A protein has these predicted regions:
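Structured core of small recognition/catalytic domains
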Residues: 181-270
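Vicinal oxygen chelate
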Residues: 22-28, 30-41, 61, 71-74, 86-169, 197-203, ...
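Sec-exported extracytoplasmic/periplasmic mature domains
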Residues: 50, 54, 103, 112-116, ...
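Hydrophobic h-region of N-terminal signal peptides that target proteins for export
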Residues: 10-19
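Amphipathic N-proximal alpha-helical interface segments
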Residues: 83-86, 145, 222-225, 292
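Core segments of cupin and vicinal oxygen chelate
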Residues: 27-30, 36-80, 175-219
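Sec-dependent signal peptide recognition
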Residues: 2-10
Length: 319
């Protein structure tokens, strides 16, 4: 509720087309850095990403008990999937989403000038990159990352990217959103994300809004709801999308791997509302990993929906 009140207060103080601070220029936001999930069994989830999907794990971080606490699954030199071996919190399996910038410190100043709560300073994380977090209107944790030349990420540049991995690119991350306008104020008006598509499965109410980062091709998918799913069901909504050139070939590759015998769920290829071929897989905790082609089935853009946003039981923080 505090998150809701804070963002409603910000909405009252800014015009619809807001340039933050007037003098503080927004640094570049270049793309999705990673998406982080809580996992109940780290070894099983590692097997899902490594044995079934073909990714590698260049490094991990240990907890106070000496056991692995966070595993880093590498998609490419700039994008990772982070697995937290910790109990899930109020947002289901979602820990946080992250975007990378060319200047984290200036981004902190920029966000602060617009009334967004930020830390007092920008420090280096355990892997050596500048980073800090903010909260969006729905209570999702959003990390801002600036890659550093002496970081673990830089150390692994050009490495641990096998040809057999199922994808080379995280196209988007998707998160549940209960009230569209506060999210648009943060992601569109403050962070500069550009809306490029709206989708509706029924034609009566809006389901998705796609927002591209201002200085790259990756995007954020806002997953609108009228009734908030319980935490154990949010893994199908809060999701990560891996781009593949041919979904049917990708599924055939997965089906041919020995690890497929351990993955008992069916993998179906279908055409989404956005008219792109896609297939969904689910990790051991039910978090959805979407495989999707970059183009529509006929090369023509899918029309954007004009359906209204749902009237939701919105509660800031997704409690």
């Amino acid at each position: 509720m505090r998150s809701t009140i804070k963002w409603l207060a910000i909405l009252l103080l800014i015009p619809a087309r807001w340039t933050v601070g007037g003098e503080v220029k927004r640094p570049k936001i270049l793309g999705v850095a990673h998406m982080a999930f809580y996992v109940s069994d780290l070894q099983k989830t590692r097997a899902f990403y490594k044995d079934l999907l073909g990714f590698e794990e260049p490094f991990s971080l240990k907890g106070k008990n000496g056991a692995d606490r966070i595993a880093f699954i590498k998609v490419n030199d700039y994008q990772y999937i982070e697995l937290f071996a910790e109990p899930a919190k109020q947002d289901g399996q979602l820990n946080h989403i992250a975007f990378y910038t060319d200047d984290a410190r200036k981004m902190r100043e920029y966000l602060s000038s617009g009334g967004v709560a930020v830390p007092d300073t920008v420090g280096k994380g355990q892997t050596g990159n500048f980073n800090y977090t903010i909260k969006d209107p729905d209570g999702h944790t959003v990390e801002i990352v600036e890659y550093q030349p002496d970081s673990w990420t830089a150390r692994e540049k050009g490495k641990r990217m096998p040809e057999g991995r199922i994808s080379t690119h995280i196209a988007h991350v998707g998160v549940l959103v209960g009230s569209l306008e506060p999210s648009m104020k943060l992601y569109r008006d403050i962070l500069g994300f550009g809306e490029f598509w709206r989708g509706s499965s029924s034609g009566r109410v809006l389901d998705w809004v796609n927002m591209r980062v201002p200085d790259g091709e990756d995007y954020l998918e806002l997953m609108l709801y009228s009734k908030l799913p319980p935490p154990e069901k949010r893994g199908g909504k809060n999701h990560l999308c891996l781009m593949v050139p041919d979904v049917e070939k990708a599924v055939a590759t997965i089906n041919a791997r020995p690890a497929r015998k351990e993955y008992v769920k069916p993998i179906e290829v279908r055409v989404g509302t956005n008219r792109k071929r896609q297939a969904n897989l689910f990790d051991p905790d039910g978090t959805r990993i979407e495989l999707m082609e970059p183009k529509t089935i006929d090369g023509k853009p899918a029309p954007s929906s004009t359906a209204p946003a749902p009237s939701s039981e919105y509660r800031g923080g997704l409690k």
